């Protein structure tokens, strides 16, 4: 039986192995994609085009450059922070705060699982 206690839920997420953390990387699909594929969400992978829906970068659209399962975040083109020394670094975003507008379907396995 799984506990309802928030501390144990947090601990389970924190200590989850990477193959389980992959399931936490889901994001909503745009209306057009949702109708086309008959599903509301999909896991975010590098190459997908996403639109930021929450936060300081709301409305920004760009390609996903990197996915970090360890941190549970993604890096998106155009979402950058400038450090004090002037260098630009990608600003990590949680996948729950983005909407997928274009899917990367080069992987046949992913394409078949989404088209089901």
Curated annotation (Swiss-Prot):
PROSITE patterns attached to this UniProt entry: RIBOSOMAL_L24
GO biological process: translation
One annotated GO molecular function: rRNA binding
SUPFAM superfamilies: Translation proteins SH3-like domain (SSF50104)
GO CC term, one of those recorded: large ribosomal subunit
Highest taxon of source: Archaea
Disulfide bonds, paired cysteine numbers: none
Keywords tagged on the record: Ribonucleoprotein, Ribosomal protein, RNA-binding, rRNA-binding
Pfam families: KOW, Ribosomal_L26
The family this protein is said to belong to: Belongs to the universal ribosomal protein uL24 family.
HAMAP family noted in UniProt: Ribosomal_uL24_A (MF_01326_A)
Primary role: One of two assembly initiator proteins, it binds directly to the 5'-end of the 23S rRNA, where it nucleates assembly of the 50S subunit. Located at the polypeptide exit tunnel on the outside of the subunit.
Protein name: Large ribosomal subunit protein uL24
């Amino acid at each position: 039986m799984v506990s309802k206690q928030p501390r144990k839920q947090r601990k389970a997420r924190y200590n989850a192995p990477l193959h389980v953390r992959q399931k936490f990387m889901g994001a909503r699909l745009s209306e057009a994609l949702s109708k086309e594929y008959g599903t509301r969400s999909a896991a975010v992978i590098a190459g997908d085009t996403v639109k930021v829906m929450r936060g300081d970068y709301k409305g920004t659209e760009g390609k996903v450059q990197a996915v970090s399962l360890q941190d549970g975040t993604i890096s998106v083109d155009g979402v950058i922070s400038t450090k004090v020394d002037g260098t630009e670094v990608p600003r990590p975003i949680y996948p729950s705060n983005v909407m997928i507008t274009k899917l990367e379907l080069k992987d046949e396995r992913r394409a078949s699982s989404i088209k089901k």
